[in-house]
C-alpha cells in the first residue's frame, strides 16, 4: 500500500522552507545595495510579461493590468477584441489582489463557472463546470492539454484564460462548455527577486519566492518556490499542506531562434473533506434533498484513517525559429507523471441513517499513477492573397496518457451492513449526525485491492486557423481540426455494474472533425460585433485520465457526443484600451447525449438532448487611473430536452447556476494605499438530472487593503467571505454537499528587489 512516509514529507517540507530562507537571504543582501536602481528599472520596464507562452518570447505587457488584450495561445490568430468568441483572461494582478491561493479561488472571479463534487478522481476544486458542462478534462497548460489527473496550484501561474462555448477546433476532445488555459511563469529579460510571506487565520502559513536573473544578454533563468500550510476556516480537522518548485531557463532573447526548458513539481498532503450529508433519502423533484441542518464545522471523516496525497512532475521543452519576418515554426514537448493516493469518508452515502441522527462513513479510495506526454508543432504565417490579409496557424498534435489505478480494499471492523447500529458505532464506521467524533478508533482493515484498471489514451490531430482581414471593417475567422482519439481500458474487476468478476479489456476508437467560423464587423477601431458558429465532440473515455470511470461495457461502442454553439456578441475597448466590455448571446446544444438504455439498464445510448442558452456580460480594466474593475454576469437557461428517463425531460442541468454575478474592484486612495472588495452571487444548483438534490443560492463578500511601505516592501490584507457566510459550493448527485470555507483573514508581506 503506497501510503507515503510522514517523516519523508516533513523532511521535504523543512528542506524547502530552509532553501527559501537561504535563497532570500543570499539574494537580498547584494540586491539591497542596488534597490534604487532595480526599483527604477522595474518602473521603466513594467516587468516584462511573456504573454505568448506558446511563443517563447512574448509581447511586453503591464503586469499590474486588469485588461489583457491578446490570448497567449497561438491558435487565437487575432486580438481578443476581434476574436469571435467569449474569452476571459484572469491576469496576475487579479490573482494577487483577490488573495487567490487555489485554482478554484481564481476561477471564482469570472462568471459562468461552478464546481462539481464527486466520489473520486480529481480533488473537487479541479472539477469546473463551464456554462453547464463538465470541463475537468479541458485544462491546458501553455496551450497544450494538461494530461494526467492532478491537483493544480497558482504559484507558477502568470494568467488564466477561460474560453467559453464548444471549442474542439481549438482543443480536441471535450470543451463543450469551454476550456481553461493556464499560462506558466517563464524567464524574462530582467533581474528581480520577489519574496512573499503570508500569515492568516486558521494557522495559514504561505511562503513564495520568485527569482529572475539574466544570463548574459540573450538568456535568463527563473525560479519559483512555494510552501503552504493551512487549516480550513469553519471546518474541524480539515487541513491542506503543499510545496512546489518551478525552475525555467530561456535562451535566445532578441534572436531568430528561441528555446525554453521548464520543470514543475508539486506535492500535496491534505485531510480530504466531503462536507455534509444530504437529508432526504426518499428524494424527488417535488421533495428535493438539501444539506443537513447541522453545525458548519461538523466533520464526518476519520482523522487517523483519511488522507489525500498527490504529486505532479512535468518537464517542458519549447523551441521556435523565425524562418523569415512572416513565418515562424515552433515545437513544444511535455512529459508528465502524477500520483494520487487517498482514502476519504463519504458521509452516509444515501444509506438513510441521517433521518435517525447518524452518519455512515462510506470509505472511498484511489491509488493511481498517471504518465503521459504531449508534442505539438505549429507553423504561423502572415501573408496576402490579393486584397485579403491572412494570419494563419497550422499544426500537428500528438499525445499519450497511461493511468494505472488500484483502489484499496477497505473492510469494516463492524462487519457487513451500512445501517448504523451499536456495532458500527463501536467500530468507527458510523458516527453521530449532530456531534461527529473524527477521533474515533476505526477498527477496520486496509489492504491493496484485487481490482485494478489500466487506461491508455492516444490522440493524433491536425488543425488550421486563419483570420482573413477582408477590409478595415470586416474579418472572417476560420478553424478546422481532425482528431483520431483511441482509448483502451483493461484490468481486473469485481462483480458489479460491468458484469461478473474477472479480467476485462475494452476499447473505443473515434475519429471526428470540428470547426469554428466567425464573421466580425468593426463599426469602429475600438469595437467589434460578431456572429460565430462552433462545434465540439465528447468521445467515450474522454475523462478517463482525470480520475473518472474507465470505459464500461455500456459505452465502449458508442460514437462521440456532438455539440454545437451559436453566439452573437460584441466587444469594446475604451479609455485608450484601458477598459474592455463585452456581451454575448449564445445557445449550446448537445444533440446526442449519452443516457441510460430504456431496454438494458447497464447500457447507454446516444438518445439524449441538452441545451444551455443565455447571455454573458463582462468587464475588466480601468474606469479611471485609480479605479480598476473585473467581473461579469451570466444567465444560463439550461434544459434536459430529451432523455430515456422521461421524468428528467424539462429539468435543469446539474451544476448549472441560472444566475451568476462576480465583481472585484480596487481603488487607490493614496499613491501607496489601495482598498478593494468583491462580491459573488451564485444561484441555486441541482446535483443531478432528476433535480432531486440541490444547494441553495448565496452571496459572498470579500475585502482587501494594501500599503506600499517603500518601493521594496508592501503589505496586503485580504478578508475572504467577510460575513462568515455558511454556504455550499458543490453538490453531489446523491450523497453530500461541500461546505465552502468560512471567514479567512490573510496578511501578506512582500519584498521586491
Swiss-Prot record:
Pfam families: Plug, TonB_dep_Rec_b-barrel
Domain TBDR plug: residue ranges: 79-185
InterPro entries given in the database record: Plug_dom, Plug_dom_sf, TonB-dep_rcpt-like, TonB-dep_rcpt_b-brl, TonB_rcpt_b-brl_sf, TonB_sidphr_rcpt
Knockout consequences: Deletion decreases sensitivity to siderophore-beta-lactam drug conjugates; phenotype is complemented by ectopic expression of PiuA or PirA, or by heterologous expression of probable siderophore receptor PirA from A.baumannii. In a pvdF and pchA double mutant background, in iron restricted culture, growth inhibited by 60% in the presence of dopamine and delayed in the presence of other catecholamines such as epinephrine; growth is inhibited further, but not completely abolished, when pirA is also deleted.
UniProt keyword list: Cell outer membrane, Disulfide bond, Ion transport, Iron, Iron transport, Membrane, Porin, Receptor, Signal, TonB box, Transmembrane, Transmembrane beta strand, Transport
Disulfide bonds: 420-430
Matching PROSITE patterns: TONB_DEPENDENT_REC_3
Protein's membrane topology: Multi-pass membrane protein
Domain called TBDR beta-barrel: residue spans: 190-753
One GO MF term attached to the UniProt entry: signaling receptor activity
Family: Belongs to the TonB-dependent receptor family.
Biological role stated in the UniProt entry: Involved in the initial step of iron uptake by binding iron chelating siderophores, thereby allowing extraction of iron from the environment. Probably involved in the transport of siderophores, including host catecholamines such as dopamine.
Protein name in UniProt: Probable TonB-dependent siderophore receptor PiuA
Annotated organism of origin: Pseudomonas aeruginosa (strain ATCC 15692 / DSM 22644 / CIP 104116 / JCM 14847 / LMG 12228 / 1C / PRS 101 / PAO1)
Amino acid at each position: 500500500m503506497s501510503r507515503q512516509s510522514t517523516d519523508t514529507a516533513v523532511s521535504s517540507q523543512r528542506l524547502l522552507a530552509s532553501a527559501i530562507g537561504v535563497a532570500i537571504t543570499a539574494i537580498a543582501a547584494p540586491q539591497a545595495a542596488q534597490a534604487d536602481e532595480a526599483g527604477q528599472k522595474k518602473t521603466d520596464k513594467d516587468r516584462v510579461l511573456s504573454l505568448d507562452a506558446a511563443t517563447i518570447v512574448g509581447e511586453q505587457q503591464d503586469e499590474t493590468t486588469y485588461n489583457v488584450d491578446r490570448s497567449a495561445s497561438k491558435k487565437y490568430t487575432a486580438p481578443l477584441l476581434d476574436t469571435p468568441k467569449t474569452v476571459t483572461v484572469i491576469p496576475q494582478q487579479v490573482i494577487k489582489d483577490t488573495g487567490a491561493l487555489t485554482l478554484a479561488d481564481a476561477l471564482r472571479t469570472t462568471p459562468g463557472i461552478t464546481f462539481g463534487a464527486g466520489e473520486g478522481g480529481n480533488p473537487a476544486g479541479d472539477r469546473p463546470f463551464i456554462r453547464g458542462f463538465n470541463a475537468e478534462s479541458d485544462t491546458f497548460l501553455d496551450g497544450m492539454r494538461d494530461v494526467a489527473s492532478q491537483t493544480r496550484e497558482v504559484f507558477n501561474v502568470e494568467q488564466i484564460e477561460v474560453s467559453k462555448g464548444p471549442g474542439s477546433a481549438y482543443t480536441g476532445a471535450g470543451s463543450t462548455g469551454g476550456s481553461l488555459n493556464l499560462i506558466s511563469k517563464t524567464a524574462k529579460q530582467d533581474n528581480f527577486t520577489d519574496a512573499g510571506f503570508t500569515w492568516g487565520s486558521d494557522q495559514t502559513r504561505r511562503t513564495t519566492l520568485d527569482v529572475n536573473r539574466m544570463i548574459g544578454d540573450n538568456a535568463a533563468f527563473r525560479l519559483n518556490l512555494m510552501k503552504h500550510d493551512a487549516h480550513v476556516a469553519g471546518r474541524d480537522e480539515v487541513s491542506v499542506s503543499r510545496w512546489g518548485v518551478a525552475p525555467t531557463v530561456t535562451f535566445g532573447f532578441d534572436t531568430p531562434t528561441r528555446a525554453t526548458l521548464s520543470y514543475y513539481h508539486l506535492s500535496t498532503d491534505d485531510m480530504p473533506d466531503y462536507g455534509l450529508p444530504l437529508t432526504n433519502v426518499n428524494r424527488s423533484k417535488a421533495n428535493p434533498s438539501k444539506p443537513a441542518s447541522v453545525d458548519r464545522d461538523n466533520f464526518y471523516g476519520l482523522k487517523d484513517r483519511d488522507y489525500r496525497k498527490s504529486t505532479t512532475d512535468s518537464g517542458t521543452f519549447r523551441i521556435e525559429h523565425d524562418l523569415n519576418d512572416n513565418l515562424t515554426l515552433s515545437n513544444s514537448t511535455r512529459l508528465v507523471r502524477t500520483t494520487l493516493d487517498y482514502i476519504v469518508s463519504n458521509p452516509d452515502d444515501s444509506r438513510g441513517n441521517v433521518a435517525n441522527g447518524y452518519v455512515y462513513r462510506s470509505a472511498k479510495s484511489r491509488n493511481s499513477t498517471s504518465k503521459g506526454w504531449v508534442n505539438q508543432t505549429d507553423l504561423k504565417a502572415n501573408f496576402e492573397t490579393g486584397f485579403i490579409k491572412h494570419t494563419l496557424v497550422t499544426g500537428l498534435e500528438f499525445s499519450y496518457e497511461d493511468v494505472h489505478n488500484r483502489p484499496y480494499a477497505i473492510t469494516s471492523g463492524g462487519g457487513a451492513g451500512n445501517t448504523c447500529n451499536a456495532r458500527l458505532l463501536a467500530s468507527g464506521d458510523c458516527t453521530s449526525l449532530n456531534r461527529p467524533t473524527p477521533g474515533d478508533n476505526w477498527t477496520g482493515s486496509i489492504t491493496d485491492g484485487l481490482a485494478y484498471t489500466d487506461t491508455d489514451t492516444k490522440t493524433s490531430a491536425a488543425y488550421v486557423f486563419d483570420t482573413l482581414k477582408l477590409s478595415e471593417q470586416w474579418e472572417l475567422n476560420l478553424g478546422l481540426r481532425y482528431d483520431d482519439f483511441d482509448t483502451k481500458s483493461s484490468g481486473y474487476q469485481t462483480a458489479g455494474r460491468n458484469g461478473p468478476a474477472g479480467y476485462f479489456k475494452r476499447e473505443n476508437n473515434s475519429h471526428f472533425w470540428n470547426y469554428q467560423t466567425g464573421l466580425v464587423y468593426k463599426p469602429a477601431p475600438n469595437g467589434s460585433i460578431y456572429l460565430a458558429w462552433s462545434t465540439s465532440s465528447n468521445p467515450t473515455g474522454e475523462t478517463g485520465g482525470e480520475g473518472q470511470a474507465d470505459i464500461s461495457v455500456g459505452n465502449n461502442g458508442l460514437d462521440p457526443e456532438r455539440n454545437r454553439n451559436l453566439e452573437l456578441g460584441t466587444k469594446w475597448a475604451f479609455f485608450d484600451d484601458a477598459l474592455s466590455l463585452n456581451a454575448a448571446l449564445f445557445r449550446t446544444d448537445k444533440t446526442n447525449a449519452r443516457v441510460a438504455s430504456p431496454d438494458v439498464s447497464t447500457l447507454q445510448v446516444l438518445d439524449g438532448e441538452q441545451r444551455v442558452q443565455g447571455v454573458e456580460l463582462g468587464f475588466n480594466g480601468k474606469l479611471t487611473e485609480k479605479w480598476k474593475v473585473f467581473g461579469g454576469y451570466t444567465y444560463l437557461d439550461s434544459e434536459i430536452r430529451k432523455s430515456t428517463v422521461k421524468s428528467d425531460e424539462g429539468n435543469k442541468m446539474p451544476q448549472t447556476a441560472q444566475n451568476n454575478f462576480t465583481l472585484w474592484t480596487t481603488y487607490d486612495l493614496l499613491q501607496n494605499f489601495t482598498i478593494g472588495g468583491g462580491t459573488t452571487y451564485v444561484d441555486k444548483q441541482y446535483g443531478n438530472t432528476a433535480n432531486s438534490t440541490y444547494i441553495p443560492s448565496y452571496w459572498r463578500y470579500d475585502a482587501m487593503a494594501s500599503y506600499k511601505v517603500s518601493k521594496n516592501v508592501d503589505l496586503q490584507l485580504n478578508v475572504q467571505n467577510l460575513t462568515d457566510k455558511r454556504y455550499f459550493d458543490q453538490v453531489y448527485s446523491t450523497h453530500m454537499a461541500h461546505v465552502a470555507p468560512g471567514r479567512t483573514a490573510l496578511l501578506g508581506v512582500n519584498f521586491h528587489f
